[in-house]
Swiss-Prot record:
Quaternary context: F-type ATPases have 2 components, CF(1) - the catalytic core - and CF(0) - the membrane proton channel. CF(1) has five subunits: alpha(3), beta(3), gamma(1), delta(1), epsilon(1). CF(0) has three main subunits: a, b and c.
Function: Produces ATP from ADP in the presence of a proton gradient across the membrane. The gamma chain is believed to be important in regulating ATPase activity and the flow of protons through the CF(0) complex.
GO molecular function, one term: ATP binding
Protein name: ATP synthase gamma chain
Topology versus the membrane: Peripheral membrane protein
GO biological processes: proton motive force-driven plasma membrane ATP synthesis
InterPro entries: ATP_synth_F1_ATPase_gsu, ATP_synth_F1_gsu
Record-level GO cellular component terms: plasma membrane; proton-transporting ATP synthase complex
Subcellular location: Cell membrane
Keywords tagged on the record: ATP synthesis, Cell membrane, CF(1), Hydrogen ion transport, Ion transport, Membrane, Transport
Length: 286
């Protein structure tokens, strides 16, 4: 027979844990909504930047250091993960993709260089034999556009002097509250812009299309990084919300089972006491 005091203590412990998981679920939901709002707020500006760059890149005579394809001797992987755990497979999935991309670069004879954004990404690559050149833990929740621009300018300067032949991004994109998908994309050299928007043949760029294009690269890079970091943060919160919702449901199910166990133990105890009283009464009468 289960010890009633132990079962009661266990029920209280699980109830306390469920209060925590429900609170974390609510906090994650709130942070997820705010992150989505931040991403949507800057979208029109960056859409305009991309459209101008796309318009310039359609000119067959146009050339820029930021569009020239090179042999990929050295590739910078900017890896964005979370700052905390308790988010299901969020961190594991994006870091698994990043590792696969880094290993593929190495196996093809190139060098994979890592820039990690998020505490989990920094910790992951610090513990492994990868070339980690920079780390930015715990910046995602409060990141401003100026922070993303600062990181972007660091990358741009090193790309211009030839430290990297390509810059690629690994992060998690928000599909829905229930679905978040790890993504990999090339951001430098810039490619495939010619497929965006409409051609504007009467547009004249001063001082030159090349200079205008190159001057927009910091906004382009900053926008890509800012959007990816905010998107990743929203994905992290969605994954945490789902994980905490599942934990709360499991805790509630456990409480129901423990309560049933407690009630059965209590019923058995009462039955035993009645039996003992009845037996004592019969003995007295005899």
């Amino acid at each position: 027979m289960a010890n009633m005091k132990d079962v009661k203590r266990r029920i209280k412990s699980v109830e306390s844990t469920m209060q925590i998981t429900k609170a974390m679920q609510l906090v994650a939901s709130s942070k997820m909504r705010k992150a989505k709002e931040r991403a949507e707020a800057v979208h029109p500006f960056f859409e305009g930047v991309f459209q101008v760059m796309a318009d310039i890149s359609r000119d067959h005579e146009f050339t820029s250091v930021f569009t020239k394809k090179k042999f990929k001797n050295s590739v910078l992987l900017i890896v964005i993960a979370g700052d905390r755990g308790l988010a299901g497979g969020f961190n594991t999935n994006v870091l698994k993709l990043a590792k696969a991309k880094a290993d593929a670069i190495t196996e093809s004879g190139g060098e994979a260089v890592i820039m990690a954004i998020g505490k989990k990404a920094v910790e992951y690559f610090e513990k492994r034999e990868y070339k980690l050149i920079d780390g930015f833990p715990q910046i995602a929740e409060g990141i401003e556009l100026i922070d993303a621009m600062m990181i972007a300018n660091k990358v741009i300067e090193r790309f211009k002097i030839g430290d990297f032949d390509a810059v690629e991004l690994v992060y998690t994109t928000f599909v829905s509250v229930m679905t978040q998908e790890p993504q990999h994309l090339r951001i430098l050299p810039v490619e495939n812009l010619e497929y965006l928007g409409q051609k504007h043949p009467m547009t004249i760029y001063d001082p030159s299309p090349e200079e205008v294009f190159d001057s927009l690269i910091p906004e382009y890079m900053g926008g890509m990084l800012y959007s990816a970091i905010v998107d990743s943060f929203a994905s992290e919160q969605a994954a945490r919300r789902t994980a905490m919702e599942s934990a709360s449901d499991n805790a509630n199910e456990m409480i129901e089972k423990l309560s049933l166990l407690y009630n059965r133990a209590r019923q058995a105890q009462i039955t035993q006491e009645i039996t003992e009283i009845s037996s004592a009464s019969l003995n007295d009468n005899s």
